[in-house]
């Protein structure tokens, strides 16, 4: 799902990072480390003006697509009524236009942290993934083509970036047991 549900009143927010399926447990381990590395950088350094502008421009152009069907228009109209706000597109676009990089960085500092982060991995070899995570096994990235030295150097740091997941907190579930 790439769009939030319409007509569903929210009382709290969730922050999630999703990683696409990868070739192997090593790649999944590396990608998870990369996500945490980048999240830690974002929390420490905030967002740059350039990244902020690019993201805000993307979102301003994306918001109208969220109400592309009559079904979603009705759902978001009900949401606007529930929250007592302007129509969805008008409300969100006006807020995005007024938003500043300082606002975003303040909210990042006040609200994002990785102390109680939770991970879910879906893999064909859960025991291997469990071992990798518990032992903080290195997860070097291997490319099919030559990459710039700067990227390779950063990848070496990321390959050993600590996820710090206590072994006692790592549980492997068989797929047929997940929804019991």
Q: What residues fall within each predicted segment?
A:
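M16 family metallopeptidases and their MPP-like homologs
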Residues: 1-101, 114-123, 130-137, 180
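Proteolytic maturation boundary segments
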Residues: 91-180
């Amino acid at each position: 799902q790439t769009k939030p549900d319409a007509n569903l009143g929210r009382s709290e927010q969730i922050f999630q990072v999703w990683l696409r399926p990868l070739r192997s447990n090593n790649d999944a381990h590396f990608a998870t480390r990369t996500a945490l590395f980048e999240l830690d950088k974002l929390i420490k350094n905030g967002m740059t003006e350039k990244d902020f502008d690019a993201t805000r421009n993307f979102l301003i152009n994306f918001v109208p697509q969220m109400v592309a069907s009559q079904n979603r228009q009705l759902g978001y109209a009900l949401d606007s009524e529930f929250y007592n706000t302007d129509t969805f597109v008008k409300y969100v676009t006006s807020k995005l236009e007024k938003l500043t990089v300082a606002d975003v960085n303040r909210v990042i500092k006040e609200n994002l942290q990785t102390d109680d982060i939770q991970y879910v991995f879906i893999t064909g070899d859960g025991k291997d993934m469990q071992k990798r995570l518990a032992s903080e096994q290195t997860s070097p990235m291997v490319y099919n083509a030559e990459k710039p030295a700067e990227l390779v150097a950063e990848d070496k740091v990321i390959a050993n970036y600590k996820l710090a997941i206590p072994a006692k907190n790592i549980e492997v579930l068989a797929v047929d047991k997940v929804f019991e």
